[in-house]
């Protein structure tokens, strides 16, 4: 570059013929230009940071990258955030919190349960009647997944049989299984076959045939709704301890399995708080676990179930979001 003829007022004057002062000026000018070019060629800055803390990575691949192949949700029942996070009765779950990511300001949308299950899967409350026995038409998480060529399953503990869309068979409770209400599932035998007993999850994991999206439904003895032996007369620590041990025994092995650990995300949450009405359904825990999730990360941004629905779809590369999920705040900050 310095061999090129440079014009400074006289024709055919090259660098070697310039006076010392001009050489110094030109050298400084060239260094300044080079510095400018280097600074312009640097990496871009992502300005979409969220209100989070921790040691998570700074950006990684975009949501929907091939590194995320499975997204699952397990939903427990009726517990306040403050009763779950940091509670010594739940050492396994709180250990996962320390290693993964936590939404510290996550709120259910409504009371009672059923409206939150529908919000997680349709982006609408639909009803607040836990005894609702109708069917639901329109877009939902399964129609969005199917249209995008993705697979799904609902793994329900104590489900009487595969493809069952009937009423309660205690300790299986229908209104904890929103998929059983969708007409797009009820009227299609292929879709209906995606509602399976929970035991099928272990078989699918062993066969490396986990679906892209899955929803785990513990029964009422294990989800914190009832006491472990039935009924409602037991200390809270008994219910929380049962949730924790069930989670560790039944989903802990999956989190360590090579078919899931590196490319899967499990979201552990609750349908509603026990006695808090903040933002409709109260503050609840939402824990994000898996290889693609930031480590030791805590978000202080406010979210509700429409954002969770959006996250589960968008992370798998789906671009159509039902109901309120279409405009819900993005949760991409939880990914590496």
Where are these regions (language model features)?
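N-terminal secretory signal peptides that target proteins for export/translocation
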Residues: 1-22
């Amino acid at each position: 570059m310095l061999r090129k003829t440079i014009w400074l007022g006289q024709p055919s004057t090259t660098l070697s013929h310039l006076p010392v002062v001009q050489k110094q000026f030109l050298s400084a000018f060239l260094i300044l230009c080079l510095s400018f070019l280097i600074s312009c060629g640097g990496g871009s800055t992502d300005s979409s940071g969220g209100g989070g803390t921790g040691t998570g990575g700074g950006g990684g691949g975009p949501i929907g990258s091939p590194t995320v192949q499975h997204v699952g949700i397990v939903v427990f029942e009726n517990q306040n955030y403050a009763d779950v996070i940091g509670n010594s009765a739940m050492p396994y779950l709180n250990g996962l919190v320390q290693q993964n990511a936590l939404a510290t300001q996550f709120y259910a949308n409504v009371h009672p349960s059923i409206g939150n299950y529908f919000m997680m899967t349709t982006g609408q409350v639909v009803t607040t009647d836990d005894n609702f026995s109708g069917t639901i038409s329109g877009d939902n998480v399964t129609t969005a997944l199917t249209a995008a060529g993705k697979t799904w399953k609902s793994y329900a503990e104590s489900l009487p049989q595969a493809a069952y869309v009937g009423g309660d068979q205690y300790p299986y409770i229908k209104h904890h299984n929103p998929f059983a209400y969708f007409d797009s599932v009820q009227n299609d035998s292929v879709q209906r076959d995606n509602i399976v007993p929970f035991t099928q999850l272990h078989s699918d994991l062993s066969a490396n045939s986990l679906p892209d999206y899955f929803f785990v439904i513990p029964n009422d003895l294990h989800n914190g709704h009832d006491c472990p032996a039935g009924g409602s007369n037991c200390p809270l620590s008994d219910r929380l301890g049962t949730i924790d041990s069930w989670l560790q025994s039944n989903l802990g092995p999956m989190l360590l399995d090579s078919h899931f650990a590196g490319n899967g995300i499990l979201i552990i949450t609750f349908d509603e708080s026990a006695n808090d009405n903040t933002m409709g359904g109260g503050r609840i825990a939402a824990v994000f676990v898996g290889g693609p999730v930031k480590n030791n990360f805590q978000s202080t941004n406010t979210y509700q179930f429409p954002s969770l629905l959006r996250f589960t779809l968008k992370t798998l590369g789906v671009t159509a979001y039902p109901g309120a999920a279409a405009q819900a705040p993005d949760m991409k900050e939880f990914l590496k």
